[in-house]
Amino acid sequence: MSHSDPLFDEVPDRRGRNSLKWGKYEGRDVLPLWVADMDYRSPPQVIEVAKNLAEFGNFGYGKPSPALTELVIERMESLHDWQIQPNWLVWLPGMVCGFNIAIRAMGKEGDEVLSNIPVYPPFLMAPGNFGQNLAGVPMILEEARHTMDFDGLVSAISPQSKTFLFCHPHNPVGTQFTRHELERFAEFCLRYDLGVCSDEIHCDLLLDPGAQH
């Protein structure tokens, strides 16, 4: 899809249609830009598949499509020069449940989860879902760019530190960490034996020309 696709000329009015995005500030003069939820119609191909499923009339359990798995493998290689295997992929209904599962798997009640802040709000709530504590380390601003405060990260380490909940590109500040920063981050996690859960859902939204995730 390109920016000239006619799909972008049609914007359905979702107000009054059980929309989480539009319902949050319903009745107020507010544009709801608080959530990653587009207002364009879905592509015709997606609508057609949904129609066919509805007309079939049975919504029993399914399994991941081999074609979709292959497409993800091809995409990782073509966009990110990363060769992955089919058995590395675990299909989940959403990213938030994914990092909640990771926190539960890598720690226990009373453990600590480190993260750079500010950050996507569900990061802040996830550790508490399992009796764990968030150790948020403020990012630092250098030449109009937010980056990790490695001294602050070291200071935040405790015997209870077990997991690092990482976000790259970082939401909400938009930082795409450099290779040097990522290598330094990896060394930090190895030194303190931290499991890493990395949310990279925005990896295709790179605005700098020539940038690669």
Where do the model's predicted regions map?
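N-terminal small-domain helix-loop-helix segment of the aminotransferase-like
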Residues: 2-94, 101
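Aromatic/pi-system hotspot detector in well-structured domains
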Residues: 29, 177, 190
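Short glycine-centered segments of the SAM/dcSAM-binding site in methyltransferase folds
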Residues: 112, 194-195
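Conserved core of the PLP fold type I
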Residues: 59-187, 204-205, 210-213
